[in-house]
Curated annotation (Swiss-Prot):
The protein's name in its UniProt record: Putative uncharacterized protein Q0182, mitochondrial
Organism superkingdom: Eukaryota
Keywords, comma-separated and alphabetical: Mitochondrion
Recorded GO CC terms: mitochondrion
Localization per record: Mitochondrion
First-listed, main subcellular location of the protein, grouped into a coarse class: mitochondrion
Amino acid sequence: MVSGPGHGSRNPERSFIINMKRVRMMMNSFNLFLMKYNFKMVFMVRPAPRGGADPEGVRSGINYNNYINIIIIYYIMMYLFMFYNINNYFMFNKYNMYIIFFNNYTINSYFGGIGRHDTTKMYYFTVWRFKSFK
């Protein structure tokens, strides 16, 4: 059975260890990247209270817990980094990076109106593609 480091390696245990090392390296570089460039301005916070009936948006059916949003976006970005750079040992050297912006938009509901608070909170993602820095 071939156990070398190249394409011919058919050792499942060795392949699993190598892939786990790659994932660990990618996670370490991702954490360093988050520490180097501050991403706090990327994440959207919950809307401010606007007064009137239901000022906090309780009837909208969405939990505005920003830490949950940050965790969700962290893992989505991690999956993007893994699937775009699974074979690259150094992520930020020469390849593109993909960053997701987590936007919270308030749009008018199409399900019939009962008042001025009849809105639907919609989450959608915007992918920003840019060249990585050295």
